[in-house]
């Protein structure tokens, strides 16, 4: 399969996963949908690793990091993402996730001492301005709603979406430690998804969340799409693309996917951004593209894992 086709596959799948999450909402609690999704995804990845002849057992020094990655990325982050999409259109959540491009180097600075360049700081400042423009009017309306005695659920959704980007970034930074012990990406992903599934399932059971099987066909279509396409096939295309054209080019998938998410929201969720929102999105995405063109880090700096540069629900 050619590189342009692989690039298109990854962009289209990850760009549509934010909307596909909306198919999972309403029938059961978000935690239940997450357990179903990553339970199926991890089982698929484990099966694939077995077919390749991989040894599934991993030493404890690797498992402890995969547990942390799973809880941060596939548990807390996705619970926040799914819950936030109950209050925000999926396009807004997708645009917020590009902030991970800036959270990641900041986390690496604290954990590994990786220096931050002026270009990264400048791009982050532009991106923050874009986010402010994107959310200025919705936040104003939500605040007026609160003053009028309303619930202000939009602000809750915004806070949860931001929390999702931060916890997902933490999980991605932890991958640095995982990669030091194992280079088997699909096996470590399978274990991380397993631990994330176990964490969400345990929390759901302890809080009395009801587990049941929805009857709506679109729910199961969304589940299969998110589990198999969004969590397995897209990553396969992404890593193959990295091997062919390099991570510096493949990472631009992270700029294209929010655009696809916005177009889908306009078509399927009746999202109608105004001039200020469009300008905010352009600022945010262009700043990300600028940041991704920054020079590579010095040789003595710890490398950022390939999959930490891009993460999509």
Task: Label each PLM-derived region with a short phrase.
Residues 1-4, 27-31, 35, 58-64, ...:
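Juxtamembrane helix-entry segments on the extracytoplasmic side of multipass membrane proteins
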Residues 45, 104-106, 110, 141-208, ...:
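Transmembrane alpha-helical segments that form core, pore/gating elements
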Residues 15, 39-43, 128, 194-198, ...:
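Small-residue-rich packing faces within the transmembrane alpha-helices of Major Facilitator Superfamily
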Residues 27-76, 103, 166-174, 189-208, ...:
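Transmembrane alpha-helices of multi-pass small-molecule transport proteins
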Residues 12-13, 17-20, 46-97, 103, ...:
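Specific transmembrane alpha-helical segments of multi-pass solute transporters/efflux pumps
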Residues 45, 99, 116-139, 145, ...:
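Hydrophobic transmembrane alpha-helices of multi-pass small-molecule transport proteins
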Residues 32-43, 73, 78-124, 247-266:
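Specific alpha-helical transmembrane segments that line the substrate/conduction pathway
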Residues 34-36, 90-99, 174-197, 227-267:
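Helix-helix packing/entry segments at the starts of transmembrane helices
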